[in-house]
Amino acid sequence: MEDQHSAASELGSSAAPTLPPPPPPPPPPTSPPPSLQQRQQEPTETDDAEDTCSSSSSSSASSECFVSPLEDTSSEDSADTVLPSEPRRDEEEQEEDSPDRYMDADVLQRHLLRQSTILRQVLQEAAPGAAAEAAEAPSVAELSRRLEAALFSPATPPRRQENGTCAPDPRLNFYPVFMLPEALATYLLFFHNQKIPVSCRANRPRADAHWRLPSGTPLPDYPTTDEVYKIFEGLGDEEPACANQDLKERDSVLVELKLDNPRLAVVKQCIAVTHFAYPALALPPKVMSTLMQTLLVRRASPLPDEGETPLEDLLVVSDEQLARWMHTSDPKVLEERRKTVTAACMVTVQLHCMHTFLTSREMVRRLGECLHYMFRQGYVKLASKIANMELSNLVSYLGMLHENRLGQHVLHHTLKHEARRDYVRDTIYLYLVYTWQTAMGVWQQCLEDRNLRALETSLARARQSLWTGFDERTIAQDLAAFLFPTKLVETLQRSLPDFASQSMMHAFRSFVLERSGILPAVCNALPSDFVPTVYRECPPPLWAHCYLLRLANFLMYHCDLAEDTSGEGLFECYCRCNLCAPHRCLATNTALLNEVQAINTFELQRPPKPDGTLPPPFKLTPGLWTSAFLRHFVSEDYHSDRILFYEDVSRPPRVEPSACVITHSAILAQLHDIKKAREEFLLTKGHGVYLDPHTGEELNTAAPSTAHHAAPPEEAHPQQHQHQQQPSHRRRHHRSSYADRVRSELHAYGGATGSSRDPVSGGCSARGTHSRDAARRRGSQQRDQRQLRRQFAQYPRGTGGGGGTGHTDEAIQALLHQQQQQQEHQPAQELRRPQRGS
């Protein structure tokens, strides 16, 4: 996380806008800002407060939607800005008549005042020496760095709320710019306009059938020009809808075919396109410029008096030098070598860097996890239900988290079959493009002149070995070792990929289509429709897009997103991928199911401390379980390099599925038995009708209910008849005292555990009296509880399995084992009483 914050800080420091030093207090305007008037001036009467609120609400709506008042914590400086309030009605009438109303409003003043207040607080929170230096010679870079560090990497971490999120900070009240794809367009060349091949996916209606991946399919690989030396960009065996349709006379490369699905048929009828703005996937321009000038062609710099420089004079490696290195003077061999090196520098090295960055084991796992968040799939759906918090609303950018509560993540369930697969595949393709462009943008910004000089020196030293490499693939691998070293790859992988939502990818999709001249509102085209499906039908400049599209198709099947395999009950959150099954799925992990059923059903309390204070108890809460569950990843049963679902494997998993907090199955089994015995005791020994709090069904038999509600003869049930003759106020008192006794007995019966739900208050109508055995059982259980607490004081506190706070599994196991041994020597075991009674 420190690397993420440092990367974010380094990113923002170079891209941050120019911030002036704190300005002096502005001259008094005709009316102060309503936000300052409302916060700094306390009204003396209620009418004044109402006038202030009304004037604040009647101000510019555009300013109120993105500028929020910041509470002024300074003492003297901020007091200078307090201005007396004046009525704003005359000013509003003047603004209505003014043609430049927006510029006459106080939006800019409020914004500058707010930013200066934040910056002043940042300087006050800094060290005294640093603050003095900044006051003497303030620097824009220093102010930007301090402002960014105080906002995004504060020295004191923000306070966390009960649900795990940070408390709202008014200083961060802005819409995150990283949620808009245009924010990345300033880092490098964002688009690459090129003619659309006729062999694109839109003209391949059977591509979805060819893209189906069976079990055992490995990760896709990238090609080279040595392997794919012929490119076909025609329709092939696809049959057009009109037999006499001439492609040369058409003004669009999209051809209406007989096998087109309904979406593609509508797309081809709506638009006529020949070119498309493909998102740029090249390496940073500074790196590519250094590579070209060092290995291939020098930059031409003609003098004013001279003409163009011949190409032979611009070549870095002349024919004579290349002939000496290759030990041959054959022109065909030399020309073929130049083509190989040029292809390796322009195409293959980019594909190798992309393959290295996106297909490592850790990166594939993170991509799968982010896709589970994006599509609310599998274990993320289960964690959201247990924690009662929508985890799919979280989005991030280089470690900066933001909760986007308006992002949608379930609309893909409205699509079926091929339409669903096309949408999911295109969304993952855009997500890979988004991730790669983010990495290239960070790399481009962090490059310095000394880095480029060091790269140029390294390439110049290895020039002969690169030109005399074995083949195109090995040359590209050697080039990637200089351009994209392992340390750089690991640094970028620590901060990427980011959490994203389908709404962000939809905005990205609209952004790409709009730059291509396609209106998304009337045309349901996808950017992946204009990418070829196979390498032999794709020109080399688009091989990177073809590779990402094939990788997106692999990830769709690898994460089990192609179809909806969920069901009802335990299969509501079922997912077949290795991230979920078998260790994070209730249908395949019995221990995890027992642990979920034990949430909020028990509590272990230690004896008081010597000072009389009670230590915090151990209680399995939904938040504790969710935190441990999200970290419950078993790498031994994860297959990142191929599609291998758990249900398709005959052998058992390498690691036995277990719970994530209470890892010992014996503890979970005994907690489950205690809970079950407690419920059976209430159903069999208690009198009356016990209703399920969720469904309202009767949990016990109907005989006791009928007997209690009927009017039996006096000789058959004298006590009950006598009870019915009691006054109404005594019957109400009797029922309330009975509920209290059952509730107290329920707590005593659980020993060290507490009840998760009170069956009496959850729908119980009880009558009658208790026998003397209930009092004896209650006293016996209370003594056992006190003895258990004294024994529990011998064990130290620790951390529970899975990272949750509480006691260790060994301490819990020892306590429950001692309690079980003591109960085995007692013939009238309390846990078995309900079974004998039933």
From Swiss-Prot:
Residues 356-474 form the RRM domain. Belongs to the adenoviridae shutoff protein family. Induction: Expressed in the late phase of the viral replicative cycle. Residues 1-102, 693-838 are annotated as: Disordered. HAMAP family: ADV_SHUT. Residues 291-353 are annotated as: Binding to host EIF4G. This is Shutoff protein. All late proteins expressed from the major late promoter are produced by alternative splicing and alternative polyadenylation of the same gene giving rise to non-overlapping ORFs. A leader sequence is present in the N-terminus of all these mRNAs and is recognized by the viral shutoff protein to provide expression although conventional translation via ribosome scanning from the cap has been shut off in the host cell. The gene is L4. Disulfide bonds: none annotated. It comes from Porcine adenovirus A serotype 3 (PAdV-3). GO terms for molecular function: RNA binding. Residues 737-746, 770-787 have a biased composition (Basic and acidic residues). Residues 18-35 have a biased composition (Pro residues).
